[in-house]
Amino acid sequence: MQEKLKKLIGDNINFVFVGEAGSGKSEISINFAKWLVQLQDKPVHFFDMDMTKPLFRSRDVEVQMEETGIICHHEKQFMDAPTVVGGVNRLLKDEDCYVVMDVGGDHIGARAIGGYAPKLNKDNTIVYYVLNAYRPWSNDIDHIDGTLGQILGVSHIQLGKLHMVNNPNNGITTTAKEFIEGSRKMSEMVTPYIAVDFACVREDLYEEVKDSSDVPVFPVELYLTYPWLQNDLPNGQPVPGRG
């Protein structure tokens, strides 16, 4: 896993996750930060930039994240009042640490990083656009292009900075078959225009699907689960990942 990650990130130290709401950005960004911690070469700072929703926020599992060694940054949110997280500019310039930014969904969430564009467009940063073929605005290339264009417009991220992540899932009930079919569909849609860097799958499905994709597959541990999600599972099964 570590060698695969090192090859993926190269010399980059800042990693930003954007995409459609519900694409799985937060779960992936949390896991990505955890993988960086496991490299044991630099401290990892995690910024929760999401101001768009009250649930499925990385800040809600801050304790679990810090137990893995991640240094968390966020601001408390009241209703829909906008908040600005401190320390972003300083740490984006620090070459002795990694920075991971979890950005809110769609163009509404992406507005939060527009002011950091001059730093995010530098050579030491990767902006990951998370794609989920099972989301309504990612099921065809026209919808993907429309959502992507809106996000780039408000975030001021250069198109050339974008790297694609394939995250085909239907939540905690996702099957291996759904991952394989969603991964294939997304690859057929986007790879004629831009390469996909890697794919993510729920960790209990990893062994079953790891060789099914033409890009590296990374196993994702679920952090942002809630007890009521268990109602979606048959026969009272426990929620995969952290309950």
Where are the language model's segments positioned?
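Hydrophobic anchor at the beta1->P-loop junction of P-loop NTPases
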Residues: 17
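The conserved Walker
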Residues: 21
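Conserved lysine of the Walker
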Residues: 25
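Hydrophobic positions on the alpha1 helix immediately C-terminal to the Walker A/P-loop
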Residues: 28, 32
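N-terminal phosphate/diphosphate-binding loop that engages ATP/GTP or pyrophosphate donors
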Residues: 34-82
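Switch II (G3) loop of P-loop NTPases
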Residues: 74-78, 96-112
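Conserved catalytic-core segment of NTP-binding enzymes
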Residues: 108-213
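Long hydrophobic alpha-helical segments typical of transmembrane helices together
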Residues: 193-243
